[in-house]
Amino acid sequence: MKNISSAISFQEKPEECKRLLADADLIFMLDHNTVAREGDLENWVVASPAGRVIIDHHPDPDPQQYVISDTQVSSTCELLYIVMSQIWGKEIVTPDIAGALYTGINTDTGGLSHNSSHPQTYRIIADLLEAGLDKAYIHERIYQMNNLSRLRLIGNVLLNKLEVNEQYPVAIMPITREELDRYNYKDGDLEGLVNIPLSVHNVCVSVQITERRERVKLSFR
């Protein structure tokens, strides 16, 4: 996506992120419902004098924040489009903005395979196409570009770590920190992995347990 190189990662530049948060007038928190989901950033977000706005589609948003929330939309990017178009009109959406919004809608719905049964979602995608969205380019960047270490990490998990309970329709994938380090894990390398076991007949629940530094992350589908 255009300008993604200008995004600042807390993992890579923590001091710069802290400075920006301290100097901010307003902080937007997208696709999570509480500041507690900020992880390592939480303390710095809370300490900032800036106002905080949550834009999210998950249930039970933090009532202490300014909240724009709708659990009926497919994704936060769908909600973001609605907010933007209501404030500035549809003409605010450039081809680059359309690409960014479609990327969020597509990835948050598993390629429009879940959480996307409402006609509104497809009407918004039509609006994005009219705004200049290059859908084929986005699909290629999301689904057809991999690095070798990511493929090997996913292959190892599916071959050696995936467990399916024969009594209950549950698949479990435990992933250790040592395995992440062995395959040079980078943020995003496990994106979508938790959905794969759901393609197995009779598996209704998929659980991914990922050991991170100082915490364990559980992902459910």
What residue spans do the PLM features occupy?
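N-terminal small/polar loop signature for handling phosphorylated ligands or for N-terminal nucleophile
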Residues: M1-A47
